[in-house]
Regions:
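Internal maturation/activation junctions in enzymes
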Residues: 285, 303, 327, 587-610, ...
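Active-site cavity-forming subdomains of large catalytic enzyme subunits
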Residues: 172-226, 309-560, 564-570, 577-578, ...
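Terminal amphipathic helices with adjacent charged low-complexity linkers/tails
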Residues: 78-79, 83-88, 162-194, 425, ...
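Gly/Pro-rich turn-and-neighbor structural signature
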Residues: 251-321, 468-495, 499-504, 649-700
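Catalytic alpha/beta core of large soluble enzyme barrels
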Residues: 212-220, 224, 228-237, 529-533, ...
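Core structural elements
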Residues: 65-68, 138, 153, 231-241, ...
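Core nucleic-acid recognition elements
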Residues: 9, 32-261, 277-283
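Long, structured ligand/cofactor-binding scaffold of large enzymes
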Residues: 141, 146, 177-182, 230-232, ...
């Protein structure tokens, strides 16, 4: 039998569609209907219809009559209402398709009806909203803008999926624009596109130099446009504006899926075996939104200037040449979109001597002001100003002024509003704060200590640091600036509440857990407080004049020190089946390999960073979608269940990452300083209480095979890449379940991921959460993270200074290494783009 569709086309009759519609009608009135009854009703319909062909309406009319003839009046009524509703939806769909009049748009609307069948996503609602924005003589682009705006405005906490519908319209609009640009340039295949982009210096020539045409065509077959449906409107809007390749005049030249494939091609470029398999695995993990790479990797992979690293950390030495070199290093890093951490703990304090002249030194503040001006001046091609965190030790003589760098009162000549201050705390400071805030606290100049004692106090930690610090305090030859612990705490908390900073770095906790303590010390962290790796200042060796072949040159020789660089990626926990151990291990293994490849493929803005990165081969695998993961499993943030669950999850992630790194070491070789490390001795595993047979087996494997990477895990804030993946940022709880954000004249819906009746109450707002649970959870996770975590504290106006201090003390007692922002409810803070993995 043939069926005549409303469009006039015919198709084969399918009785299953009729039984499905009748079943829904029975369900809608709360009646159960056995399959044999449905089959009998269908048989009656078919007998009464005869051979056909029949229109859809004629078949539906017959279904109504048969239902009533068999006494199912309520069911028939429901079926009639169902038909009426379908007619309304069809009418709305036809009106919308007629408004756009572009090929393929009707299919988009049909898919939306199929994928979002709930009443609150009816196209008649969209049409009614769209009609209010519609005007005569609109272009296709303007009509689609109106449709997108309508879908965005329909997005609410009760109907959150409209943000996915808005994304589909945006993607369709982008596709039309892209198709025009490709046609104009005569681009057909993916290979043609790469050839064109390479010729225009928008793609790195290295891609086509490494891959054959056949391999590019094989890669093109990996593309899955259906994965565009995973984007929310906010995520797709961000990706199209910031990440896809555009011409020098802003014309789009790459689809979202081609962007992910281009990144995968770059990251797998140097694989010796099964290279195309790795291309597919890298593409799949990115396009399925199970993993996000850091913002510089997403932006710059596949391009001529492929600076893929997020953050850099430099130790500022105590000499004029070294200070200006560090500032220049920051400028070079900022130029290519990286963020910086600068450790100023070695720089002499205000009033210290220079070449024996007492009182000549101007202190760290004037140098930090130069860093501040550099951040403003080197603004990444006018896109955004540079970002830098400046770290100072809690015993440094300039600390009181340092803690007022960003506050609103005081001498403006001593301010630096565009840097992010951070303080490095020894255990002794917190011990005294816990015991009695009136304890004396002695501030010292590092140059005075070095001159009198012959050692740098900051080069030690733990009990040895405390012994030497107290010895310096007792030594009358060393000038001191004596305050109380309360004085420092008051300045810290005042600045934290006003500005969100200083960040906190618990140096003894960090260095005790350092798996590479045999090679040095960790002075500070990076811009986003998640990196903790060995550091050493760059040293000038000599400057000489050389003449040869009629030319004179000045040659400066330096020792590279250890300038830290971090390559980041994040597991999107909300999109991963974290309970599936084999799936998690395979995914972690894939992303660890990708990050390890970044080290060799990277364009380094500084030669010092290249040397450190290739010696240590450090990576920073983190997570995003943490609150998303908890909510979709019905786990309350403020619960012991939360702590127990994440303890297991992060232990499995750590196990998988270590296993991946040791297997890479077996395949490609271990990092330079493995011998003598905690990895090699087994101390890493003992310190963390990893004593199960499974862990002992892994420890033995590591000792035998080595580790490819000196450092593995670091949890970045992921402020922008979490938007791309449609998940919650980093380890943070959500700010609100739903809100509309205005950006450059347009409204962006922000909805908690998978918001529904089931998840609603598990999405508690960050400022309403008891922060002690957040700190305790951070302590639980920290055992499994060899570096650190970007963790924010959320406070309200009801918090007393004592309560905020208690959170810092709890963090220290819980083994938390760093604290990022203190987010007061009324405070707006600037996010780091570079670490947004």
């Amino acid at each position: 039998m043939k069926v005549i569709k409303r469009s006039g086309t015919t198709q084969e009759y399918d009785g299953k569609k009729i039984t499905s519609a009748m079943q829904k009608a029975f369900d809608s009135v709360g009646q159960t209907c056995r399959q044999e009854v449905l089959r009998d009703l269908l048989s009656q319909v078919e007998q009464n219809l005869g051979e056909g062909p029949h229109t859809v309406e004629a078949i539906q009319d017959m279904v109504e009559r048969i239902l009533m003839a068999n006494g199912y009046y309520d069911v028939a009524k429901s079926y009639i209402l169902y038909r009426q509703k379908r007619t309304e939806l069809r009418s709305a769909r036809m009106e919308l398709a007629d408004a756009v009049k572009e090929e393929g748009f009707g299919k988009i609307l049909l898919e939306i009806q199929r994928d979002f069948p709930e009443e609150e996503y009816g196209l008649h609602l969209l049409y009614n909203k769209f009609s209010g924005f519609r005007k005569s003589d609109l272009t296709i682009h303007e009509i689609l803008n109106a449709l997108i705006k309508a879908a965005v405005e329909l997005t609410t906490s009760e109907a959150p999926k409209w943000e996915y519908i808005a994304a589909r319209f945006l993607n369709y609009q982008f596709g039309l624009e892209l198709a025009q640009e490709l046609k104009k340039r005569g681009i057909g295949s993916f290979y043609d596109k790469l050839r064109y982009l390479t010729d225009k210096e928008l793609y790195g020539a290295y891609v086509l130099e490494r891959y054959s045409r056949q391999e590019i065509e094989q890669a093109e077959a990996f593309l899955d446009p259906q994965r565009d449906k995973l984007f929310t409107y906010a995520g797709l809007d961000l990706l199209l504006k910031r990440y896809v390749i555009r011409s020098h005049h802003g014309a789009p030249l790459e689809t979202p899926q081609e962007m992910y494939l281009g990144i995968a091609l770059h990251l797998a470029m140097e694989e010796k075996e099964n290279r195309m398999d790795w291309v597919k695995r890298f593409y799949d993990m990115l396009s399925r939104m199970e993993v996000t790479m850091a913002t510089p990797t997403l932006s710059n992979a596949r391009k001529p200037y492929h600076q893929l690293s997020s953050c850099f950390i430099d130790t500022v030495p105590d000499d004029l040449t070294g200070i200006y070199r560090s500032i220049d290093n920051f400028a070079q890093v900022s130029k290519f979109g990286g963020g910086m951490g600068l450790y100023f703990g070695k720089v002499r304090a205000t009033g210290s001597s220079i070449r024996g002249f007492d009182g000549a030194a101007g202190g760290v503040i004037r140098w930090i002001k130069l860093v501040n001006d550099t951040a403003v001046a080197v603004d990444q091609l006018g896109m955004r100003q540079g970002a830098v965190a400046v770290y100072l030790d809690a015993w440094h003589k300039d600390l009181p002024e340092f803690l007022q760098l960003r506050t609103n009162n005081g001498d403006d000549r001593m301010k630096a509003h565009d840097v992010f201050p951070a303080v490095c705390y020894p255990d002794l400071f917190w011990k005294l704060a816990e015991e009695d805030l009136n304890h004396e606290w002695h501030l010292l100049c590092p140059h005075d200590v070095l001159t009198v004692k012959g050692y740098a106090l900051e080069d030690f930690y733990g009990e040895e640091w405390e012994r030497r610090y107290l010895d310096c305090v007792r030594d009358p030859r060393i000038p001191k600036r004596t305050v109380t612990v309360k004085d420092i705490v008051r300045l810290v908390l005042k600045s934290a509440v006003e500005t969100g900073t200083p960040f906190a770095f618990n140096r003894d906790t960090v260095n005790r857990a350092n798996p590479n303590g045999h090679r040095g010390i960790i002075y500070c962290s990076n811009l986003c407080t998640e990196i903790a790796q060995n550091m050493a200042p760059i040293e000038s060796v000599s400057t000489e004049i050389r003449t040869g072949e009629g030319d004179t040159v000045v040659v400066t020789t330096t020792r590279p020190g250890e300038l830290v660089v971090c390559n980041l990626a994040s597991l999107v926990l909300g999109n991963i089946p974290v309970e599936d151990d084999s799936y998690l291990h395979e995914l972690v293994g894939t992303v660890v390999r990708a990050l390890d490849n970044v080290i060799d493929l990277n364009f380094y803005p500084l030669p010092y960073a290249k040397i450190t990165n290739r010696r240590y081969r450090s990576i920073g695998l983190g997570v995003s979608g943490y609150h998303h993961m908890l909510a979709r499993r019905g786990i309350s943030w403020e619960s012991e269940e939360h702590l127990a669950f994440v303890d297991k999850v992060f232990e499995r992630i750590n196990h998988a990452a270590i296993e991946a790194s040791t297997e890479l070491s077996r395949e490609k070789g271990c990092y330079d300083f493995f011998e003598g490390s905690d990895w090699q001795t087994g101390a890493y595993f003992k310190k963390r209480g990893y004593d199960t047979p499974e862990w002992k087996e892994l420890a033995d494997k590591v000792a035998a095979q080595g580790m490819r990477n000196a450092y593995l895990l670091a949890v970045a804030p992921t402020s922008s890449t979490s938007i791309l993946a449609g998940t919650t940022a980093g380890l943070d709880p959500i700010m609100k379940r739903f809100f509309l954000e205005e950006k450059k004249g347009s409204m962006l819906p922000r909805v908690a991921p998978e918001l529904s009746i089931k998840t609603y109450w598990y999405y508690k707002n960050a400022h309403l959460i008891d922060q002690r649970w957040s700190v305790r959870a951070c302590g639980v996770r920290q055992r499994h993270i060899d570096q650190a975590q970007s963790v924010n504290l959320y406070i309200t106006n009801d918090y007393t200074m004592r309560q905020v201090l208690e959170l810092y003390l709890l963090a220290w007692r819980s083994g938390v290494k760093t604290i990022y922002y203190v987010r007061s409810r009324s405070l707006e803070v600037e996010e780091c783009e570079s670490c947004a993995s």
